Amino acid sequence: MKLTKTFKAFFENEKSGGLLLLFVTVISLWAANSSYSAGYIAFWEKDLAGHSITHWINDGLMTIFFLLIGLELEREIYHGELSNIKNASLPIMAAFGGMLIPAATFLALNFGTSTQNGAGIPMATDIAFAIGILSLLGDKVPASLKVFLTALAVIDDLGAIIVIAVFYTTSIGFVNLAIALGIWVFLFVLNRMKVYNLIPYLIGGVIMWYFMLNSGIHATITGVILAFVIPFGDGGEKSTSYKLQHFLHQPVAFFILPLFAIANTCIAIESNWHIGLNHPNAFGIILGLVIGKPLGILLFSSIGVSAGLCALPKNLKWAHILGAGMLGGIGFTMSIFITLLAFKDPEIIVFSKIAIIIASIISGITGFVYLRYILTTNKNT
């Protein structure tokens, strides 16, 4: 399977971005637990136009990340792995299992408790981290495994977006929502009229973001729906969608996601931090990501192939799918993002973040070691 030029560029940026995320996370955790802790934590909570700096990153800059995800998803649907139903069905089935089983695992431990709202936390996959770890294995990785993991993670993020929109919206301001959707319809009309200039779409997107923010629906959803009205054309290098997607890759990989990681891993770990891990919430997150993710991905992929709904690529074995499932358990930035929507209690948020970091480390290490073993030995499984 050949990799397209666009996919290669995406993979390279995500690879480097994943390694950068790892670095800044370590630095942020160190700073939050050093002699600079008080000033460091206070900086991210500093008020800026009525909200903390962290809030502006989470509700503002992350909208740009979701815009890129939307553009990637659009390209996959029109020209990539998701354009052919036979090819798309395997990562779709895998992603479905990779969301359902972790959520069910979490709910099995938390249903009926004050933390049951966190079921969406172990459903997510951090694309940058997962691909970053996979890239460390070098040229041994089959091209189809790279494509599978990327498509799986993109679909996973789409699922996370739907979860955010449906389950983490407490109250809706219908007037603001109607205005936001009206702007989207206007931009859609511009698209159909073949208006290719990017400026009106970006201006409309900013205005739509403002009204979406005040509607009660998480403003980052704006990024995804905006992506689907930006002209795609033939998808070539001169298309509006391609130009924007290409432009956003590096700012997202090397600025927005690292900034999000720094701001949201600013965690002062107390001496009794392990006590919070005895809570069903932490157990649910860790088991959901470490066990539920690979189990769900492998199980539903197997069901899809057995039922004739999809096919396993020729150079992939079930061992590869299991390894990809392990890397899918790296929830990190996306899981933290959902945590901030699911909970209001600062203590629960901190313990949830610690659980996510632990689960992501376990998933990353086990996935890397396992895939390295099977790729090195070329074991037939």
UniProtKB/Swiss-Prot annotation:
Protein's name according to its UniProt entry: Na(+)/H(+) antiporter NhaA 1
GO biological process terms held by the UniProt record: regulation of pH
Entry's transmembrane regions: 18-38, 53-73, 89-109, 118-138, 147-167, 170-190, 210-230, 251-271, 283-303, 321-341, 348-368
This protein's UniProt keywords: Antiport, Cell inner membrane, Cell membrane, Ion transport, Membrane, Sodium, Sodium transport, Transmembrane, Transmembrane helix, Transport
Known catalytic reactions: Na(+)(in) + 2 H(+)(out) = Na(+)(out) + 2 H(+)(in)
GO molecular function per UniProt: sodium:proton antiporter activity
Protein's membrane topology: Multi-pass membrane protein
Top-level division of the source organism's lineage: Bacteria
GO CC aspect terms: plasma membrane
A Pfam family hit: Na_H_antiport_1
Gene name tied to this protein: nhaA1
Organism of provenance: Flavobacterium johnsoniae (strain ATCC 17061 / DSM 2064 / JCM 8514 / BCRC 14874 / CCUG 350202 / NBRC 14942 / NCIMB 11054 / UW101) (Cytophaga johnsonae)
Family from the record: Belongs to the NhaA Na(+)/H(+) (TC 2.A.33) antiporter family.
Protein localization: Cell inner membrane
Protein task: Na(+)/H(+) antiporter that extrudes sodium in exchange for external protons.
